[in-house]
Amino acid sequence: MREKGRRKKGRTWAEAARTVLEKYPNTPMSHKEILQVIQKEGLKEIRSGTSPLACLNAMLHTNSRGEEGIFYKVPGRMGVYTLKKDVPDGLKELSDGSEESSDAQSDSQSSENSSSSSSSDGCTNKDGRKSRWKRKVSSRLSQTSSPQTSCQSPSIQTGKVISSSQKHSKKALKQALKQQQQKQQQQQCRAGMPVSSNQHTLLKAVKAASASTPTKPAWIGKQSDGHSNSSQNSTFSSSASVKLDNSLPGLGKKPFQRSDRLHARQLKRTKCAEIDVETPDSILVNTNLRALINKHTFSVLPTECQQRLLLLLPEVDRQVGADGLMKLSGSALNNEFFTSAAQGWKERLSEGEFTPEMQLRIRQEIEKEKKVELWKEHFFESYYGQSSGLSPEESERLTANTSADDGEAEKPAAEQPKCMQVKEEITSPSESKAQVVQEAPAVKKGEERRVEERREEMQPKAAKPAEASVSPAGCAVKPSNPQIQERIQGEPIQENPQPAVSQKLEEERKHTASKEVKEAVRAPVLAPSKPKSPEAGEAAAKVTSPVVVPPTPEKKPPVNEEMEVSVEGHKRKSESSEEALTTPGKKPRIAEKCQQQQPAFRSQTQSFPAAGPPVPRVPPLKIPVSRISPMPFPAGQVSPRVRFPASLISPARTGARTLADIKAKAQQVRAQRAAAAAAAAAASSGGAVPGPGPGGGPAGGGGTGNAATSGAGETGTRGNALELAGTGSGGSSRRFLPRCPGTHSPMETQEQPATPSLSRAQLQQTSVLQSRSAAGNTGTNCSSPAVSAIEQISGIKQSPPNVAINQVSGSSCAGGCDKQEKAPSAPAGLGQACGASTVRDGTTCVTVSSADSNANITRVAPAALGGTSSDVPKGTSPSPLMPSLTPTSSEAQAGGAVVSAPSAPCSNTLSAAPSLKTHPSSSGALPKANSSIPANNPLVTQLLQGKSVPLEQILPKPLTKAEMKTVPLASNEEKGAAVPGVAGSGAGAEGGERQSALSPQQLGKIFCQSRPLPHIPRTFVLPAGKEPGADQHPEALSKTTQEQILQTLIKRVQRQNLLPVLQPSQVNVAHSGFQLENSSTSQRFVLGFMGRRTSKPAMSGHYLLNISTYGRGSESLRRGFSLNPETRSCLNSPAGGPKAECGECEEMPDHGSSSEEEDADNESTGDEHEHVSVKEEPQASQVAAPCEKEQVSHGANSSDYGILAKKGVKTEAAVSQQAAGSRENSQALDGTALARDFIQAAQEQTVHAVKGKTHSSPELFSSSTPSSDSAQLQLPQLSHPHPPKLGGDAAAAQLIGPSYSGTINVSTSPDVNQGSLMSGLSECNQLSSSMGNVMSFSVTVTTIPTSQAMNSGNHSQTIPVQAFAEDSSMEDSPSKCYCRLKAMIMCKGCGAFCHDDCIGPSKLCVSCLVVR
């Protein structure tokens, strides 16, 4: 006994089950029956706590698979097992699914059943073995061959044996049948049949002995044939299913037990032989098709039938066996796609879609739709690339490649979207169409037509109509079988649904590929044949490429990659555009929008026309601008970048950034980076110019330029960034610049030639300067050729002069002179003015304020640095954008002088900053046209990318930046505040940051005119090597990039401040440079911002918005930073004020960088953020601990802010304290210190603004905050963004402050003094959320449509101020985000990151929604 017990205990489930099945050799049992026997006979000790049934079932499942399995799963039945060695012939036969046997059985059984009302009894006895076998099979009983008919296994009861799924389907069928039968009974009297008794008997019998089950397989087989045909396939073609049903009498629509039992003849007599699969009266409407059609019922169907049905399933759901026959895959009929297809079919059935009348109508509609318009016929090619001279083989290869890539990239995006696309196509397509602009749309349409026709040709006639309807939508095809089925089903695709589907997929793939090519090539898209053929695309690319000479070689591959990678995104886009084509009415508007939104790819695509299309593009850009202006956010975004339509292009995304998009961009960036590096090496320094990433060339080009520029500036890193931006997304750099995620794209595209040139010029100038100065090393220049090439591409010819100039300037100064690299910005005339004047602090480079012409390139030699002459470019800047610049020019000159001096002492960057600080007045020069360049600066790009850019490289540029600052600020202020601004802001990246600073400043102006602070930190960030911008570029030049650039700048500035303060030597800042630099940085930022602001306030606003969206503290920090210069101004005391400011600056920048970092991290462009964090921390390592703590303590945003503040404070403590004294330090240490610093900076900026009202007004904070008032306002703003904003606006109104104020949100009581500001800062810290609001405020500025106007008339800053004030009020609420701690997701429109609460179900951020 003991042994036996032990044996029982040790027995496994497999052994126990085998024992049971050996005891009942010919009785297949379900797991439940086996368990019953085990329990009854005590074959295994079942412990409590386990689920014996589940264990046994799992074991049976496992051991019935594969060669070694000891059990055999009886086919066609749910979970019925027998021992493999015992598998009887009958079973095997059954498993063969030979329909005859099962049909015959069911028939014989049913005939027997029907023979008498006691059919169930008769069946049992009479049928003897067969019917019993069937019954048993269905009930899982063994064949009757076994003597014990009643119950071989004690546990088995006929009823029980049925598996649950079978029961389920039976139940469903039973119900449906009952309903139908009742209906029929009412309708007709069936005299011949004792229906009621029969029914009852049958039902009972079924219940009792699952006799009906056996039949069920048969009838189910039938129905599932017809039905599954009808339901499963129905999705494909109801008519087909109907025919099937009719053709298979057995398909009886009665897969119910009843029909099982009823005689075939009887069925026919009672008219139950056919299941209605057409009308809404069908019983199938109330049947669970999933219960009807499962692998068991399916296996009962005749083989031919199964094969035919399998063709309707997606490839993944069918497997081809060794014998070449298809088999169902395990989950084919049990997945969500099939379920939704079945559901969809049922719904369509209930809606009467399959009635002959409806089918006829649908067919007619399809026929109508099929007529190809002449113009489409003209573009038709029987295979992809035919018109481009590809041979069919090449075409196949190409499409195979693309489709593969496509497949990967596209799958996620395409699968669902596609289905929906059909419906949405008209809407979303319009966007993408917009991108391509009307030309592209037409082309695309033709392409689509071609694809469609191709598909149709391939498809069978029946499928054709369906396909036509489906295909245009291009929706169902790829997504999933069920969907496809559904889609096609309504259509009369009976015969070849699958082929049609696969063809469709193929076509779609081709289509996608072609789209990809188009998109990838960007220019090619518009290219001659809108070629679907890669060659054409390449050719287009070539067209573009020439511009980008160095990158070209790489570019082509990138194009291909991009094609592949971005196919997914593009696919959607192109489909959309195709749809848009269909809806011409929408096309124009959408096209504009699209252009704005998808500038990167589309813009480049547009470039395909090369020189010709640019003009048309420009108008569209203009339209978008006007369109954008009205919208606060878009306008704001556009405003800054208005001048640089390129920026619009920035988002190459059409509204939805897809993984493919991102990947493609990354690939492109990589390739471009390589190209840029080579080019940079070749062109050694002039490449930076192309930096017109923001406004630069057409969409893509700008981005590329930007990336290239940064690459040049930072050499390898920068180059990479550039490439990232440029290549990554044709408009990535632009994207970066563009405030408007999607809004600007069209503008960019079209304005590019004109406005973009300006913006690009600005950017380029600055970037070149920065690049140069940043590179200060020849190494930096390396990427410049690439940049210039990119720029050219970007501007597509529009900025070739820029390029040339850039290159020239680049060559001019390797050491610290950014020199005239900026000059190249000629195309960007106005922007250039600003950018051109960017002087390098170390070398006061020449900044060519080539307002309108490259000629403008004033090569301010290093002399500029030495003297104010450096600002000459500024003065020269005739650019419309830079009206203020010109005034600044004098200031800039002064600033330039100051900068130059320090520049000598301090190696590039910091020295400039100190000088700036020292000579606030001279700082004016620095403010230069920095604003324009930021996006393009390679350094900036690198920073954005999160690459480590030497601080020195970046810092020198700050001077240029200062130069860039608009003189609008009072000379004194400019000197006092502006200089610091220049140093911190304009020169802000005082050394290597120069480039970055410029770029950021431009960006700031463009993106965040109200973001002096960010610029500064950004400057620091650059040194930190933080260039998330590049990454962001691809994502959303406009928002993300702007934000990132600003952040980077802020970080850099912070770093500068920190570095100068903490380690002057490290920063290479003049000794006094620390404090001075800090303050100068702030001021410079302010100036730069002002100038920039004037140039592109909208961008700034957008940027801010992004920040607020990001819920970054950096925004507020930036604001604070901006304030810093003002505060300093307020302080007035160069020593004390600047010192304090320095500390503040540092704090702010750190804060900004950290928050930026965090935010960036959040963003997909998180790179910047991450990098910033990292950067910041190292720089602010001293400050890091408190900062981080603060960070932790504050929420995400507040934490960011706190961190920045703390870090800044710490740094400040380290340096500022040194320089300024313990007050700053204490503040820095305190959470309030941060706020105070912030406020201080704001105050200084305010002072700046007040002094240089005109000048400042364009600037974010500076302009907003007249002086201390402004600063004070800012402080409260930080605390209470809205109210302060209003106040600030009022106060700033005098200066242009309000205009920026909105952005800056410097509207607090004007009386607040530095002290109060500081308190405010503390408050800010405490109100980290408040800070967030402030950031939100920045966002508010985003909508600075007026700012645009303001920009245009930099001089009339008052107006801009008002506009800004209004804007800020408007945007204030939207910009505020109260969910700072929540998870961030990416906006599908511009790629900006925000909280999912903010973005909401539309997946669009506030600014995109406003734009839409």
Swiss-Prot record:
Compositionally biased tracts (Acidic residues): 1155-1165
GO molecular function: chromatin binding; DNA binding; peroxisome proliferator activated receptor binding; zinc ion binding
Zinc finger (PHD-type): 1374-1411
Motif range (LXXLL motif): 309-313
A Pfam family matched in the record: ASXH
GO BP annotations, alphabetical order: animal organ morphogenesis; positive regulation of transcription by RNA polymerase II
Superkingdom as given in the UniProt entry: Eukaryota
Functional summary from the UniProt entry: Putative Polycomb group (PcG) protein. PcG proteins act by forming multiprotein complexes, which are required to maintain the transcriptionally repressive state of homeotic genes throughout development. PcG proteins are not required to initiate repression, but to maintain it during later stages of development. They probably act via methylation of histones, rendering chromatin heritably changed in its expressibility. heritably changed in its expressibility. Involved in transcriptional regulation mediated by ligand-bound nuclear hormone receptors.
Protein name: Putative Polycomb group protein ASXL2
Gene that encodes it: ASXL2
